[in-house]
């Protein structure tokens, strides 16, 4: 497959191909412009993969630019987190990290240019009055009484704003466009507002800050962006994007193109709702493994490759749609099935004693991956007392049950065939110990007499077991579209986190955060980066071996 054939195809790439073929552009320059007021989520990953991926494929450039125009909500913590997420996903920005605040002097000069052209004015309506005057989708707006101020009036008033002569909310700079426009965004939008807040990049130099719609297009032009890619909610804003660039003296006029944002089942993407989950302690933080944040997915065990593959599969369109959670889960499941070494862990343990087993124990050889001999093998201790999962034993069962049953045989993974002889129970009737016998001639081979033993279960030697905490993470919400609920918090899945105390094979004591394993017959797990200790490792379930929600949705 050629490089061109391997590239994804979508309407944006078709536009770029046409622009390059026609000579409109000789190179491609994109940007990823997050606001540093929160953590990136899987929706941002789509934009990252699109913008950086296009730059890679066309041998162009992609800038990382922080839209840092609201110092009240922004923090250097988010700047650092976003940079880390972009790099973790496997991308590298062109040149230095950029900030919209780098252009505050130029933006201020362009605002003065608009004032001098009679295209901007200082308004002293209150924010509430501005909203009232703006009108609705069915009702046109009305002009502010300050709209017809002269250039000679507006220039000193704007300077008064800049030097702190107005209180917050007492004045703003607005574009002078059309209060009767069918597009509300064009009804004299605010260009600058007053905020007495220290900025994480510029300190206290400024007390006026430009709005996103004024900043975004000028920053694109100053950086030579050729294709400014936004999600569909900014479609109407394109008119303002073009209006600003058409009315200032700037040599470059980028074009904005919109694509559908990512909507994913069983979660929410709204920053406000995600923040509520964190602040109300429904989750333990922005990196909670149930969160759709990149940091949460990473802590859960998702790989950068699986997220890139997911973004590739869902594609880029102009049609809003909701993606099944199963699509994301299948990407990580396929990745880890191929690449994760195998290990054994018992999540709900019950003791099993092999009464005729002689000696202290032995080592059995196990492949690290059943289909990849190049991944090698490991030695796992075996002994006469082991832990098995409680779900792998029944006193009575039908023929469909292929695990251990009283009076019947089963194979222990890569070890011996055993037969359940009797059980011991506590006062409440719970099985505490299963007593078995084993066939000593069946170590990793079939019984000599030819009898068939169909079931295979995993196990951990009790004498060598590593005590572990196992966190069974599941979907955070119990309905596909929690955002549509009257109270999205009311549909949080009460089983989204189940904590178990289990045992694992001793090799897992050397596990490191970010390294995934398939716990045989259980699912894919990784060491938790926050709660694990040397004395008590904590493993997070990344995803099960199969989609257990499939039947729920039918």
From Swiss-Prot:
Disulfide bridges in this chain: none
Positions bound to L-glutamine: 67, 212
Binding sites annotated in the UniProt record for ATP: 35-37, 41-47, 231, 261-262, 269-271
Signal peptide residues on this chain, from the entry's feature table: none
Enzyme class at the top of the EC tree: ligase
Enzyme Commission number(s): 6.1.1.18
GO molecular function: ATP binding; glutamine-tRNA ligase activity
Descriptive protein name: Glutamine--tRNA ligase
Stretch list, region Interaction with tRNA: 317-324
Motif ('KMSKS' region): 268-272
Entry's Gene Ontology cellular component terms: cytosol
Subunit architecture: Monomer.
Database matches in SUPFAM superfamilies: Nucleotidylyl transferase, Ribosomal protein L25-like
Motif ('HIGH' region) on chain: 34-44
Protein localization: Cytoplasm
Pfam families linked: tRNA-synt_1c (PF00749), tRNA-synt_1c_C (PF03950), tRNA-synt_1c_C2 (PF20974)
HAMAP family given in the database record: Gln_tRNA_synth (MF_00126)
Similarity comment text for this entry: Belongs to the class-I aminoacyl-tRNA synthetase family.
Catalysed transformations (reactions): tRNA(Gln) + L-glutamine + ATP = L-glutaminyl-tRNA(Gln) + AMP + diphosphate
GO annotation, biological process: glutaminyl-tRNA aminoacylation; glutamyl-tRNA aminoacylation
Name of the gene: glnS
Keywords associated with the record: Aminoacyl-tRNA synthetase, ATP-binding, Cytoplasm, Ligase, Nucleotide-binding, Protein biosynthesis
Organism name: Shigella dysenteriae serotype 1 (strain Sd197)
């Amino acid at each position: 497959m050629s490089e061109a054939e391997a590239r994804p195809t979508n309407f944006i790439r078709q536009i770029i191909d046409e622009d390059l073929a026609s000579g409109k552009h000789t190179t491609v320059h994109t940007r990823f412009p997050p606001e540093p007021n929160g953590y990136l989520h899987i929706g941002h990953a789509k934009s990252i993969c699109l913008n950086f991926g296009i730059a890679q494929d066309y041998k162009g450039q992609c800038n990382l630019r922080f839209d840092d125009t609201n110092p009240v909500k922004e923090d250097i913590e988010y700047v650092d987190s976003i940079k880390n997420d972009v790099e973790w996903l496997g991308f590298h920005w062109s040149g230095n990290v950029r900030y919209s605040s780098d252009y505050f002097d130029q933006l201020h000069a362009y605002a003065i240019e608009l004032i001098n052209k009679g295209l901007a004015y200082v308004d002293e309506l209150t924010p509430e009055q501005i909203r009232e005057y703006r009108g609705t989708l069915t009702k046109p707006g009305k002009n502010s009484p300050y709209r017809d101020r002269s250039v000679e009036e507006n220039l000193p008033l704007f300077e008064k704003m800049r030097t702190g002569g107005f209180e917050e909310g007492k004045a703003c700079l607005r574009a002078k466009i059309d209060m009767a426009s069918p597009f509300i965004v064009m009804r004299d939008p605010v260009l600058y507002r007053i905020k007495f807040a220290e900025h994480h990049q510029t300190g206290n130099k400024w007390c006026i800050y430009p709005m996103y719609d004024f900043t975004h297009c000028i920053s694109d032009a100053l950086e030579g962006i050729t294709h400014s890619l936004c999600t569909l909610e900014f479609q109407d804003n394109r008119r303002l994007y073009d209006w600003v660039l058409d009315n200032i003296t700037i040599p470059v006029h980028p074009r904005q193109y919109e694509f559908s944002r990512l909507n994913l089942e069983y979660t929410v993407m709204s920053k406000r709702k995600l923040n509520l989950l964190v602040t109300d302690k429904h989750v333990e933080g922005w990196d909670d493994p149930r969160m759709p944040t990149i940091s949460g997915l990473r802590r859960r065990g998702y790989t950068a490759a699986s997220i890139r593959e997911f973004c590739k599969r869902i594609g880029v369109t102009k049609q809003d749609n909701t993606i099944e959670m199963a699509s994301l889960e299948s990407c990580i499941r396929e990745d880890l099935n191929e690449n994760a070494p195998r290990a054994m862990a018992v999540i709900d343990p019950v003791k099993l004693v092999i009464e005729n087993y002689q000696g202290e124990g032995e080592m059995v050889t196990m492949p690290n991956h059943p289909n990849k001999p190049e991944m090698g093998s490991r030695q796992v201790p075996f002994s006469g007392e082991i832990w098995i999962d409680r779900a792998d034993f029944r006193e009575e069962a039908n023929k469909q049950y292929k695990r251990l049953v009283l009076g019947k045989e089963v194979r222990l993974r890569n070890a011996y065939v055993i037969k359940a002889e009797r059980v011991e129970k506590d006062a409440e009737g719970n099985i505490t110990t299963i007593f078995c016998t084993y066939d000593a001639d069946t170590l990793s081979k079939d019984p000599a007499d030819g009898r068939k033993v169909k079931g295979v279960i995993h196990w951990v030697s009790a004498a060598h077991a590593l005590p572990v905490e196992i966190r069974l993470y599941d979907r955070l919400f119990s309905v596909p579209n929690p955002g549509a609920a009257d109270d999205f918090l009311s549909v949080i899945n009460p089983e989204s986190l189940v904590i178990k105390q289990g045992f694992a094979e001793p090799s897992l004591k050397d596990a490191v955060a970010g390294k995934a394993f398939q716990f045989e017959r259980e699912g894919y797990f990784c060491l938790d980066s926050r709660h694990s200790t040397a004395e008590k490792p904590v493993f997070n379930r990344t995803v099960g071996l199969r989609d257990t929600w499939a039947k729920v949705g039918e």
